[in-house]
Amino acid sequence: MANPLKIVVAGPIPRDTISTYENDIIMRYGCVTHPVIALSKLLDTNGVVIPVSNIHKKDIDGIANEFKEFSNVNLAGINSKKDRGTVILLDFKDQNNREEKQLACMNPIRPKHIKKHLDAAAFVFVPITDFEISLSTLKYIK
């Protein structure tokens, strides 16, 4: 395909620690990873998905591993320069109830993080709070 569809998915990729009600501990990356993978599967060879997120340096390899089987996911929008990502603790008390704690917040996504992706056909925003994507970024894209 000459001009594949390009979709940007912006927001945190938190390092999630999940404590199940059966006391199992699961470590995964969440939030933006889910729509990125879904869009990757939908687009297949007809497009590329670019997650845009600020992360901790120690999460670079783990996040790359999350997306390794998806050849149309381009990690050029992942930034660890400031070494500030999101960390979430999910503690399931039983099958239906959980406590969630945000232990660290990523630096917000600013226009400089989006600038090289303005040619995208679509932007998908997946913030956990109103802090992750600055208003100036939304105005910049508009």
Regions found by a protein language model. Name each.
Residues N3-P4, R15-I26, K41-V126, Y140:
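Conserved N-terminal subdomain of the carbohydrate kinase-like
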Residues G11-I13:
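Active-site metal-binding loops of divalent metal-dependent hydrolases
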Residues T17, F131-L135:
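Short, well-ordered, mixed-charge alpha-helical segments that flank or form enzyme active sites
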Residues Y29:
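Short-chain dehydrogenase/reductase
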Residues V32-A38:
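Short amphipathic alpha-helix
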Residues H34, G62, S136:
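Short Gly/charged-rich anion-binding patches and loops
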